[in-house]
């Protein structure tokens, strides 16, 4: 077991030049009890948060410790999540504090297991060594390579800054919150295929039914409904036997689940766990395809109930929408967000709350509000198209693309993200944009 033995008993440091390999691909949620014990031994002297790390992180820490004071170089094929989202700020400060730097990174690719064609893992290859060993760093990405002065844990050319999980926006932006969690065991939900029959059998129930939207329903324009019984009287409930039956089954399911939370919720069987129903809000899907340039976000009102798989910003404005749907925010999201396989995993704690908003004039704010409205207007030209179709790079309408480009320019101007090349004003590249945002983040959080 490589995590239990003293590596120097196998090869003395002074006889070793390289440590390379592909340690086991095991995500943090899938580690066996034995693997968890191994990680306890490796990480407990350094951090208490290691249970959120993938198993492969153990090899990174042991190699870093082993290489101290040597010219040894290490490289591992790894699950890509060790350089995504929350894991970054747990693992990589430990490695850098031991005097190591990233020498190269080969960005995400799929590792297929020939023995089991269903087994494929999204991987990266990371090379690292003492700060004094390698001066030329290289980023390998989609067939290209970039030589840079420093590679940080977000796989970009930037200083070694770490994005911490936060409960509030560093810029004072409106709170982004989790939506409703029904905890109804599907008894308060009404599928699209059930809706017509449900209404026919109980026409008076229509006033108590609202559309329910998770990420799939929002992006793919799928219809799904729920009983939203906030404020219903006992008399009204008893007048609708089909609704009362659903409520009774919800109560029974919560009791049978027999957890402290479900038993408490059994006392309110007419209700979801939360009763969030804002008049107007922005909705953001938590997981979205990496093939999209823009994560589809949009406005909904109190006729629609947001549920798990999304995040919401109540009382958001057009200006808020313009900033969040811009290429600036998307560049930030692509860099700091976690991933599900390769799909973006948007979070309030990492992506939204750490995002540096610009300091804008009223004129800039008004301009961004107008370009944001133009995006909504362009979508409205295609009422039969889902956001999945509108934001597919192959089928995105030209009006929508142009509206986004105009919004991108307005937002970049507000950030001052322009430069002069050959006497002409142009925009920062995505990597330059992210580097600037990291500088803004550091400035906002240094105190």
Where are these regions (language model features)?
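Short coil/turn segments at secondary-structure junctions
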Residues: 46-47, 231, 394-398
């Amino acid at each position: 077991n490589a995590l239990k033995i003293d590596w120097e008993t196998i090869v003395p440091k002074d006889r070793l030049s390289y440590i390379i390999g592909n340690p086991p691909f095991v995500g943090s949620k899938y580690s066996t009890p034995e693997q968890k014990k191994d990680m306890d031994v490796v990480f407990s002297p350094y951090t208490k948060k290691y249970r959120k790390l993938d198993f492969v992180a153990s090899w990174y820490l042991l190699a870093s410790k082993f290489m101290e004071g040597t010219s040894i170089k290490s490289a591992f094929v790894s699950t890509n999540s060790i350089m995504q989202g929350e894991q970054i700020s747990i693992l990589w400060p430990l490695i850098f504090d031991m005097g190591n730097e990233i020498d190269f990174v080969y960005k995400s690719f799929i590792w297929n297991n020939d023995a089991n064609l269903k087994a494929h893992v999204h991987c990266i290859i990371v090379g690292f060594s003492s700060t004094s060993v390698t001066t030329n760093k290289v980023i390998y990405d989609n067939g290209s390579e970039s030589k840079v002065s420093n590679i940080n844990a977000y796989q970009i050319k930037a200083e070694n800054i770490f994005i911490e999980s936060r409960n509030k926006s560093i810029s004072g932006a409106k709170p982004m919150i989790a939506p409703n969690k029904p905890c109804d065991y599907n008894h308060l939900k009404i599928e699209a295929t059930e809706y017509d029959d449900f209404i026919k059998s109980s026409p008076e129930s229509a006033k108590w039914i609202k559309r329910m939207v998770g990420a799939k329903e929002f992006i793919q324009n799928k219809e799904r409904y729920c009983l939203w019984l906030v404020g219903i009287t006992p008399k009204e409930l008893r007048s609708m036997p089909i609704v009362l039956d659903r409520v009774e089954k919800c109560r029974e399911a919560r009791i049978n689940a027999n957890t402290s939370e479900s038993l408490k919720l059994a006392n309110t069987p007419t209700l979801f766990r939360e009763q969030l129903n804002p008049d107007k809000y922005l909705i953001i899907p938590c997981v979205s395809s990496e093939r999209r340039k823009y994560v589809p976000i949009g406005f909904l009102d109190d006729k629609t109930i947001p549920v798990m798989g999304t995040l919401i910003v109540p009382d958001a404005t057009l200006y808020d929408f313009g900033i969040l749907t811009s290429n600036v925010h998307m560049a930030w999201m692509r860099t700091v967000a976690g991933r599900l396989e390769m799909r973006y995993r948007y979070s309030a704690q990492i992506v939204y709350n750490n995002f540096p908003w610009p300091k804008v004039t009223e004129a800039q704010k008004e301009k961004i509000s107008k370009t944001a409205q133009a995006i909504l207007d362009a979508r409205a030209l295609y009422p039969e198209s889902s956001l999945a179709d509108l934001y597919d790079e192959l089928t995105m309408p030209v009006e929508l693309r142009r509206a986004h480009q105009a919004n991108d320019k307005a937002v970049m101007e507000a950030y001052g993200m322009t430069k002069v090349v050959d006497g002409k004003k142009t925009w920062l590249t995505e990597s330059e944009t992210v580097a600037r945002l990291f500088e803004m983040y550091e400035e906002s959080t240094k105190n």
